[in-house]
A protein has these predicted regions:
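A recognition module on extended beta-rich or small alphabeta surfaces enriched in W/G with H and D/E
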Residues: 178-180, 186-235
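A surface-exposed partner-binding patch
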Residues: 1-193, 200
C-alpha cells in the first residue's frame, strides 16, 4: 500500500489540536502499543495488516452483524496503527480503511485500545448483547467513523443518559413508557437518527430516535447491521 494512503487517512482524522502519528514496522513506538496490535504495525503488506486485525474480532460479534461483516471484509483495504496525542495524553487507535463512501472520501472506522479505557463499567453496559459487550471489553471500547459518534458504538467513557437533553419533549418519553435517565444514545447516522439502548428493556433491543420522537423498540442486531452497511452510502 502506497505511503500516500497514510496521508489520506491523516487528512480525514486530523484537525483541531490533536497530533496523529502512524506506528509502523521499525518504529520505536512498537513497544508502547498493545501486544496484539504489534503484528499489524509490523506487517509488510496491507493484506497482512487486515488479516491480523480481523483475527482479533470475535466470531460472535461478526455473526451478530453478518451483512456488515461481509461488506466490511470485502471492502477492507488496509488497517493502520496511529498514536493520538492531545494535551499531554497519548492513546493508540486502529484505523480501518474500508473502501469509499458515495461522497468519494475513504470509509474509515476508528477502533480504540482496550488498555487505555480499562474494563468498561458504564451504567448502560449491560444493555448490549453479550457479543457486543465482549467486543467492547477485548477488541475496541469504541468503534465508530472518524467523528467518534456515528456508524458504530461510541466509547463508553462518553456514554450518558438522555436526562437533561432538550431534544425530546416529555411526552415522547411517556409514549414509550420510559424516563430520560433510562435511555442512552450509543451511535447515529450522518444526520439526526439516533440509536438508543434502554435500561428498562432486555438486552438485544434498540430504540431509534428522530426529530423528537421515538420508534417502538426493535431488534438491536438487525438495526445496527443495517446502519453500519449504510456507511458506504454516505453522500
Amino acid at each position: 500500500v502506497a505511503e500516500c494512503e497514510v496521508d489520506d487517512i491523516l487528512a480525514e482524522v486530523s484537525g483541531g489540536e490533536a497530533r496523529w502519528t502512524p506506528v509502523a514496522a521499525g518504529s520505536t513506538e512498537l513497544a508502547q502499543i498493545p501486544q496484539n496490535w504489534r503484528p499489524i504495525a509490523s506487517a509488510a503488506t496491507a493484506t497482512e495488516r487486515c488479516r491480523h486485525a480481523l483475527s482479533l474480532w470475535g466470531s460472535d460479534f461478526m455473526a451478530l452483524l453478518p451483512r456488515f461483516t461481509r461488506r466490511f471484509q470485502d471492502e477492507l483495504t488496509d488497517v493502520r496503527v496511529f498514536r493520538r496525542e492531545l494535551g499531554g495524553l497519548s492513546e493508540h487507535v486502529l484505523i480501518y480503511v474500508a473502501g469509499q463512501a458515495r461522497d468519494g472520501f475513504p470509509a474509515l472506522w476508528l477502533g480504540w485500545d482496550p488498555a487505555v479505557l480499562g474494563q468498561p463499567e458504564a451504567e448502560f453496559f449491560g444493555c448490549f448483547p453479550a457479543a457486543v459487550q465482549a467486543f467492547l471489553r477485548y477488541v475496541h471500547p469504541g468503534f465508530t467513523a472518524q467523528d467518534w459518534q456515528s456508524y458504530g458504538i461510541r466509547r463508553p467513557d462518553t456514554w450518558e443518559s438522555l436526562d437533561g437533553y432538550d431534544w425530546f419533549p416529555r411526552e415522547s418519553f411517556a409514549a414509550i413508557r420510559s424516563e430520560p435517565s433510562q435511555l442512552m444514545w450509543f451511535t447515529k447516522d450522518s444526520g439526526q437518527l439516533y440509536y438508543c439502548v434502554n435500561s428498562s428493556l432486555p438486552s438485544g433491543r434498540v430504540t431509534l430516535a428522530y426529530e423528537g420522537s421515538f420508534d417502538p423498540p426493535s431488534d438491536f442486531a438487525a438495526e445496527l447491521d443495517e446502519l453500519l452497511r449504510r456507511r458506504w452510502d454516505e453522500q
